[in-house]
C-alpha cells in the first residue's frame, strides 16, 4: 500500500505464553506470521471442548497452519483474509472451534 509515495511494510512479532493450567497441552491458541506476504493471523481455541475430551488447541493450530498454506498459494498482492480462512477451515479436520482473525497488508 502506498502512503505519500512510499510503500507500507508490515512489521510484526509474537510471543505465545499459554495459561499455566494449559501448558501441558500447549494451550488453546495459535498464530502465524507470513513476512513476505505481509499477513498475520491468530486463532483462539474454545476451551470448553476439553469437557468432552477434545484439545481445542489442535483445531486452532491446524486452522492457522492451513491458513499459511492457503496464503502461500494466493497471488501476493491480492490476499483475501475471508477467503483464506474459509479455505483453511475446509481443510481442517481436527475437532474443535475457535475465533480467528487474519489480516494482510496489500497494494489493493
Label the model's feature ranges.
Residues 1-108:
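PP2C/PPM-type serine/threonine phosphatase catalytic domain
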Amino acid at each position: 500500500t502506498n502512503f505519500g509515495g512510499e510503500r507500507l511494510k508490515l512489521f510484526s512479532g509474537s510471543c505465545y505464553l499459554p495459561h499455566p493450567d494449559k501448558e501441558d497441552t500447549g494451550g488453546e491458541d495459535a498464530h502465524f506470521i507470513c513476512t513476505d506476504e505481509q499477513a498475520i493471523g491468530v486463532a483462539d481455541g474454545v476451551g470448553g471442548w476439553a469437557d468432552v475430551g477434545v484439545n481445542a488447541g489442535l483445531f486452532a493450530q491446524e486452522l492457522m497452519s492451513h491458513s499459511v498454506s492457503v496464503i502461500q498459494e494466493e497471488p501476493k498482492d491480492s490476499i483475501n483474509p475471508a477467503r483464506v480462512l474459509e479455505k483453511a477451515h475446509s481443510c481442517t479436520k481436527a475437532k474443535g472451534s475457535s475465533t480467528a482473525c487474519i489480516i494482510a497488508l496489500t497494494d489493493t
